[in-house]
């Protein structure tokens, strides 16, 4: 990877650098994600079918492990003649913004799409940063053209982008995530947008020139970003990253995570009707997908954080079949069930928290996710949904969080990893609790006796040891920092320790409560 970065300036200086690529290689995927070994991270997939070949255009994440930023210098290409064969061709360094668009800055190669035009050529719609622009947000959408999906590519509109905050009409949104449909009648439509702002517009039949007018799109509940338009049986479908969050949301409990939602329309520019969720949140906070029919089957491509060394800014593309329910009208997208390559057997551990169900006294604020408590991960630079917390502006004085097991367990220790953004004693933000304790259920809630002490230092595990107790429910009870108002409590990970290591059991259905809470 470092070698590729070092070569990039040399490649950019070569004549015809728009077609300079790192050598392709054949990859045999073991399952999802397609590239799983951590050498290359692929993101924001956009599928394309041409003849007997399925292509997937992807971005490339190159952030260091603890960097929370989208470091994306180039696009890559995956291709296969049969997804079931798991044989893929991978081309890194496929396109760089500055090598195709003279008006673009390097880096920020965000989600684009390649579409075959009526003239048989291929059009690449790319969001890039426009240099020398005084727009408040310099993201703009350019169009490149090639005779083949593999390039070489040249700017189809060398004078600059076709969409920005200044043209074809002024807007104040971030102009990224383009998706394009060539309709059966030869008319062309483009959608784009993020941060809850979706726009749509007709293009001229040259695939390049805006025809307009630009239209603000409503009706797609929870739209956040990443639109993907397709047509099936005279119905227009829109996939998109939705983040209508809440404890009872069909999409996501945490606002930082997104689902793949979908809606339908009977005309290419709407009106649109929300229909449901096609893919629940995956391991990455962002959700970006595309869907296409290939050799009689429909596939959804999306990204996750499941590759070796992966994360929210080191994502990797996956592919699964997408099926339809034609018994209803309009036909419904059945929820896609994500698959993953076989994983190594878990190693024995004393920590049995992963097999418990977690509940808390408070309605978990949408920036947090209670599932993070026992996901087995501690991060140096966590995002809010990678922890459980109580902060909501009106924080409880004595909150608790509880693990429930389906059957009684014997435990003799616990470790908790506190998060804080305020010092101890503070009554604002998230601060270490003034005190906390463990209680277990034995016909009633009882304090765990003989504990070794309850530390409250954030940013490291605080361990508590005690004589073994057997129970089905264990809880942490906190005295929040402050004297009113109170600070929130934040926990990144809570482990519960059995006396001896054992292979951890997988979490099943939610375990029932112990008595009355």
Annotated model-derived regions:
Residues 190, 195-204, 344-382:
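Predominantly extracellular/luminal regions of secreted and cell-surface proteins
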Residues 382-449, 458-517:
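Aromatic, loop-rich ligand-recognition surfaces of beta-strand-rich domains
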Residues 6-16:
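Bacterial N-terminal signal peptides
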Residues 21-109, 115-176, 181-224, 231-236, ...:
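Beta-rich carbohydrate-recognition and catalytic domains
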Residues 18, 250-252, 512-515:
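Sequence contexts marking disulfide-bonded cysteines in secreted/extracellular proteins
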Residues 1-4:
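Positively charged n-region of N-terminal signal peptides that target proteins for export
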Residues 280-281, 453-458:
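Short proline/glycine- and polar residue-rich coil/turn motifs
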């Amino acid at each position: 990877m470092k070698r590729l970065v070092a070569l990039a300036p040399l490649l950019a200086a070569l004549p015809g650098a728009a077609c300079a690529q790192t050598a392709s290689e054949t990859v045999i995927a073991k399952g999802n994600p397609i590239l799983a070994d951590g050498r290359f991270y692929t993101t924001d997939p956009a599928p394309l079918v041409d003849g007997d070949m399925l292509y997937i255009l992807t971005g490339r994440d190159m952030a260091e492990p603890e960097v929370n930023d989208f470091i994306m210098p180039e696009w890559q290409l995956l291709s296969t003649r049969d997804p079931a064969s798991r044989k893929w061709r991978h081309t890194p360094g496929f396109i760089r913004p500055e090598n195709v668009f003279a008006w673009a800055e390097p880096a920020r190669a965000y989600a684009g799409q390649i579409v075959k035009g009526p003239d048989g050529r291929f059009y690449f719609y790319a969001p890039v940063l426009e240099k020398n622009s005084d727009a408040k947000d310099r993201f703009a959408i350019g169009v490149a053209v090639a005779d083949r999906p593999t390039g070489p590519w040249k700017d189809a509109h060398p004078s600059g982008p076709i969409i920005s905050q200044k043209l074809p009409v002024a807007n104040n949104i971030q102009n990224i995530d383009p998706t394009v449909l060539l309709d059966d009648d030869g008319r062309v439509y483009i959608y784009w947008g993020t941060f809850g702002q979706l726009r749509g517009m007709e293009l001229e039949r040259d695939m390049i020139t805006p025809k307009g007018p630009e239209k603000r799109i409503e009706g797609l509940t929870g739209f956040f970003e990443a639109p993907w338009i397709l047509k099936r049986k005279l119905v227009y479908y829109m996939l998109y990253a939705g983040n209508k969050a809440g404890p009872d949301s069909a999409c996501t409990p945490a606002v930082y995570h997104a689902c793949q939602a979908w809606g339908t329309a009977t005309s290419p520019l709407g009106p649109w009707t929300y229909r449901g969720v096609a893919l629940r949140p995956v391991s990455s906070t962002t959700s970006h997908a595309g869907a296409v029919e290939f050799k009689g089957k429909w596939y959804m491509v999306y990204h996750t954080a499941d590759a070796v060394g992966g994360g929210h800014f080191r994502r990797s593309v996956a592919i699964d079949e997408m099926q339809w329910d034609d018994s209803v009208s309009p036909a419904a997208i059945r929820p896609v069930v994500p698959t993953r390559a076989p994983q190594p057997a878990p190693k024995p551990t004393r920590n049995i928290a992963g097999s418990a169900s977690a509940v808390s006294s408070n309605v978990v604020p949408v920036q947090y996710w209670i599932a993070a408590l026992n996901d087995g991960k501690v991060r140096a630079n966590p995002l809010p949904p990678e922890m459980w917390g109580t902060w909501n502006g009106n924080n409880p004085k004595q909150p608790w969080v509880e693990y429930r097991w389906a059957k009684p367990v014997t435990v003799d220790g616990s470790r908790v990893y506190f998060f804080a953004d305020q010092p101890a004693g503070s009554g604002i933000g998230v601060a270490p609790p003034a005190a906390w304790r463990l209680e277990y259920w034995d016909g009633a809630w009882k304090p765990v006796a003989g504990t070794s002490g309850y530390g409250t230092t954030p940013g490291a595990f605080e361990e508590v040891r005690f004589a073994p107790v057997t129970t089905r429910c264990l809880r942490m009870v906190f005295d929040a920092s402050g004297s009113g108002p109170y600070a929130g409590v934040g926990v990144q990970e809570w482990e519960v320790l059995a006396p001896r290591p054992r292979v951890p059991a997988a979490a099943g259905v939610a375990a029932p409560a112990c008595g009355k809470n």
